[in-house]
Amino acid sequence: MPIPFADGMLSRLGRRGAALDLIEEFEDESGEPPASLSPADLLAAEPALLLQKMENRLVRHHLANPDVLSGEQLRKLRYILNFARLADFEPGAAGPGGSRGRGDISVGGQVAPWRSRGVDALYAPLREEPDPVTALEGAKDVLATLVDDQDDQRRVLIERHGSDFSATELDAEVGYKKLVTVLGGGGGAGFVYIGGMQRLLAAGQVPDYMIGSSFGSIIGSLVARELPVPIDEYAEWAKTVSYRAILGPERRRSRHGLAGKFTLRFDQFAHTLLSRADGERMRMSDLAIPFDVVVAGVRRQPYAALPSRFRHRERSTLTLRSLPFLPIGIGPWVAARMWQVAAFIDLRVVKPIVISADGATRDVNVVDAASFSSAIPGVLHPETSDPRMLPILDELCADQDVAAMVDGGAASNVPVELAWERVRDGRLGTRNACYLAFDCFHPHWDPRHLWLVPITQAVQLQMVRNLPYADHLVRFEPTLSPVNLAPSAAAIDRACRWGRDSVEPAIAVTSALLEPTWWEGDRPPAAEPKERTKSAASSMSAVMAAIQAPTGRFRRWRSRHLT
């Protein structure tokens, strides 16, 4: 939404024009297709994305006009679109009984001619036609011309790859989608995600893969730790957060972050929550739901040019920031630093780094990954307290050629594009997914938080790149204040209610996209849900028992207002 005076404020700071120029520059450098590309160019650049958008529109039109297509016609149109998306996939990975380990098979070259024909035939009704009913009727007419040839295409592919996959495994790849949930940053505004997850889980939609940035990485790490997800217990756990528990005076020395007013002590507060039953800290590979964390790596050249207050932690004592007790609040010093955070939201300054359970980062502690992803430059500064992590983080910074790690939102606050690329590159084995994005940090007009305007505006420029990859974007509203990192119990309850209400309209869309499709017979490919592996996480009863709530009136006041 437009924000009064925001444009004038940004132009006075000389930032608005530069930011818009950067968006054009980043799109040119990325090689990703802008929305203005022709169908042929978009198909050549990213055919799977074009077909994803066509299926999305088909499903939305059908939800609004359910009497135009029969259930069978909708199912077969969706099957054709998803069959045309086939390229690389891992046989056996798709569907509720999917398993990994067989490696990828490539069929993209064989499917390419059929892909081109399908796109040419369905592009007009599913991308160009503005009237939903006319679009559905046009798609129905096209279906009649494609059915016989689709049957031949499917049969030939199965015959050619009889030793690679079965007909059931092919139909599972085409017919079943994984639910990918993207959790964006936004500080205390992100507590609404707990309610959003409550509604999602109540609908039976458990994420198959998640990726989180900034505060979204904290909520994501909770949801991913064990199955079934004890989301109501997480809401109760959130009510125990206090400023004194999560913030402290800045450390004088650090190896992997920037200087800031506060040390982020999330690793201490969430130690039991994100530890295994044997007492060891949970690693990315221990999570029950595949989960990736986005952090922003500060490039070495921009890092060297930063003001010394960002780089030299030892100067903390000179500004009295090492005192053991600090008042909580957005005073002039913190507000001034927050204005400067917008300068980090620039891909020339930072680069996205994905910490995942595959590859070299599989042994990174979950709590450390979430802490670095939430490290607001110049304000919140984390550092691992686990000696085992030091060489791992050293190697990560060296491999990525970065000097420090900061808030993942600086690189990608709602990282839908990264999630899409991770799935395309084989994160789940299957490449067929529904992408649901959560965004709690979008522009609001609030005279109390004018200092947030440059940040929210810069983050919204990132959405130009990310939005095309989402099947549905939930913009949570209302939310708690982004600066309210330790809400009261009543505020958590409100945030959960707002979160449930915000996600409600998305359920119909995700339910329709997750509905399986098939080509032959009267039901989807038979698949038995795989047996759930035992969670490595500590029990929630042990987590809640380990929390020591302050007793006494003064201690409760100090916990809420002092570090």
Where are these regions (language model features)?
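Active-site gating loop/helix substructures
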Residues: 292-421
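Helix-rich "cap/lid" substructures immediately adjacent to catalytic or cofactor-binding pockets
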Residues: 147-210, 563
